Amino acid sequence: MLFGVKLANEVYPPWKGSYINYEGLKKFLKEDSVKDGSNDKKARWDDSDESKFVEELDKELEKVYGFQLKKYNNLMERLSHLEKQTDTEAAIKALDADAFQRVLEELLSESTELDNFKRLNFTGFAKIVKKHDKLYPKYPSVKSLLEVRLKELPSHSEEYSPLLYRISFLYNILRSNFNTASEPLASASKFSSIVSNDIDMNFRSFKFWVHNDNLMEVKTRILRHLPVLVYANVPSENDDLVNRFESDISNNDEIVGSSSSTSSVEHGLGARSFDPLINTLYFDNEHFELYNDKLLKLNSAPTLRLRWTGQLSDKPDIFLEKKTLIEDEATGKSEFDLTKLQLKQKFINGFIFEGDKKFKEQTLKKLKESGTAGRDLERLEEDFSEIQNFIIKNELQPVFRTVYTRTAFQIPGDDKIRVTIDSNIVFIKEDSFDRERPIRDPNTWHRTDIDANVANPLKFLRGGEYAKFPYSVMEIKVKSSLDSSMSASSMISNVKLPKKHGQWLNDLTNSHLVKEIPKFSIFVQGVASLYGDDEKLDILPFWLPDLETDIRQDPKQAYEEEKKKLLKQKEIQKKIDGMRRLSNLKEPQHQAAVPVSQEENERITSQGDLEADGSSDEETEQEPHSKRSKKVRRRKPKATFLRILAGRDPKLMGVDSEEEEIELPPGVKKPLNLLKNAGPVNVEAKVWLANERTFNRWLSVTSLLSVLTFSIYNSVKKAEYPTLANYMAYVYFGLTIFCALWSYSIYMKRVDIIQQRSGQHLDAPLGPVLVSIVLFVTLVVNFVMAFRNAAKSRQELQIQNLEVPERIPEVLRPLQNYLFKLMGPSSD
């Protein structure tokens, strides 16, 4: 879509006159005349045109950012007025909750529109400047002029997180003191609600991508139901946020941005953010074993990282964390096993690289002197030893750093629902794999160049040393008791959410604002982004192709798709209820019939949801169970032994196959081309190579048999039994021809199955079994015939009273005589 059309469609009508006059600036550039190649004097661009354009551009900048500053200050004043109405208990009791909430809703909506206003106008200015430089390359670029003017406009670098925090505080007052608030507010837990510690709890985590255009709207939607979470100086064991409320962010114009939806990447300015800037330094070895284990879903695949807040020059607290995700394959539930140590900077090098126990001994000594319990000391000592041994055993070293800003939403004291949004994510290489030109000093745990106490330290990064993730990552954590019957699906649409938050969470996650990416991992994405071309990576994450497409959706289209999805879910549920009733009626009459269990019903429902919403490439543990047909199937003939050997029937006859034919309704025809075959065939290279490797092995068997055939045939005249040798040569020649034809036919059949994306089984054991049987029979026949001929020759010599030569030792002669009796004439 052209930007001019996009701007016209997204303009907020009350502020229409305050947006950039994009079309007017385009007319100043005489774009149409330049493209037509006109030689008219009016179409020529001269110094006067340049000065007029710059003057008009400056006027538009003043108009746009003057309005933005005015609106921002107006919002802050109105918020201050609301805060004055709630500064005492008496004022809160006398407050008109409905009117107060209406004003809050207006402020929240205007904040969203102002963020959109800022983003659209900045994009417009950037595009018009780029257009000028492209049309008139002989004239100086006005990009530097734009940057200078933007720095002079204070509202350009204005952060919107203070607005969100203040609005969040006012929403909390409504939640805490009024039961007459609107349903979203009233449904939320009270500010002081606390979860009982007596109940065993676990959590489910769901990951989403959020486009920067939608980031502010997503935050404001969440803010209506959950307050922004502000952390104290020291995080708790369950918090993976860090210990700072504010951080000074030194931004690079191409790398790190602010926490608003219009990042400072575009602005090129430093901004004061109310969201913490988190630095996470991940460990791995040269073979990327931790990455491969995590991506290949090996259970309990751990990750190791160093984490701190803000700039390292400010001497923040640094935590070394070993985090292991333990998943229950039966239920799909997961819980973290977290081992965390707080380290001092001066001891990190020795602890990581040298196995130094000095810091461990000092820490334990201080804690012992302060009266810490013996059990706690033992546990801490075990944690030190566990992490240090883990580093040494796996030869781990710092590999890359992730820098991002985080906004968290959670009701304090109630962690049943928690939402975090990580924005402006940047991955930075910090490995020392290259011995000659290491990125990081091998004897230092971090890059000293970007952690130096200088302005804009990220400017030291070279091309290829960093990668910026194009979207923000939203994570929703849902906590429930261990006996809860939550679905094992990795998609949030298939999970039963708490009643208090289910409706708005479903509305948000099914909207056009977010895209769900199951099992997304920042650690995995960082390795794939920075080291994707490395041959040591066994596999790449399934979501990489989605990064090449625009995840934004048209709101109307998303709404229509959601309506269709809900209708389909209702139809599926109705069919399931009918099937359940029928199974309950028929069960007394047919004891052999197996009733449909509740668990299977949930799986079928989940599969229906997945089909309606489009499946992801993420493989889940429940996938084999969810591929059950929901229609009445025709009977298929029973598999015979030969059909199974030939690969025409699956060996698992008790398992329903996707290939089974279903009865179609009247008037409905089976499509010739299935949707699953519409796109290009994306098959992993190892599948093709496995097929070719099998074919090559068959060719080697064919070659060996052909050598054996012609060796026997060429030595027939020299053989003791020429007739037998001649027969064997013909048998082996036929077996050679069979091997060649069989290997080629099976190879082509498997290629066809792969290209058609068929679920047909690839096993075909008839060939190997037949070759084995023929070889066994020929060996037995050769053995028997040879003994019979030997017995016949022996008998002829005895009849002629000639001496029979004995070629075997005296001990084995009884066995020889026995074989002669068994297979030929007696030697007596």
From Swiss-Prot:
GO molecular function terms attached to this record: calmodulin binding; inositol hexakisphosphate binding
Name of the molecule in the record: Vacuolar transporter chaperone complex subunit 2
Modified residues (Phosphoserine): S182, S187, S196, S264, S583, S615, S616, S626, S657
Side Cytoplasmic, residues: 1-693, 749-766
Additional note from the record: Present with 2915 molecules/cell in log phase SD medium.
Composition skew (Acidic residues), residue ranges: 610-621
Domain of life of the organism encoding this protein: Eukaryota
Cellular component annotations (GO), alphabetically ordered: autophagosome membrane; cell cortex; cytoplasmic vesicle; endoplasmic reticulum; endoplasmic reticulum membrane; fungal-type vacuole membrane; vacuolar transporter chaperone complex
Documented effect of changing K26A: Decreases affinity for inositol polyphosphate. Strongly decreases affinity for inositol polyphosphate
GO biological process, one term: engulfment of target by autophagosome
Subunit structure: The VTC core complex is an integral membrane heterooligomer composed of the catalytic subunit VTC4 and the accessory subunits VTC1, VTC2 and VTC3. The complex exists in 2 different sub-complexes: VTC1-VTC2-VCT4 and VCT1-VTC3-VTC4. The VCT1-VTC3-VTC4 subcomplex is mostly found on the vacuolar membrane. The VTC1-VTC2-VCT4 subcomplex is observed in the cell periphery, probably ER and nuclear envelope, but localizes to the vacuole under phosphate starvation. Each subunit contains 3 transmembrane helices. VTC1 is a small membrane protein without hydrophilic domain.
Topology term for the membrane: Multi-pass membrane protein
Oxidoreductase listed as a keyword: no
Chain segments annotated as transmembrane: 694-716, 728-748, 767-787
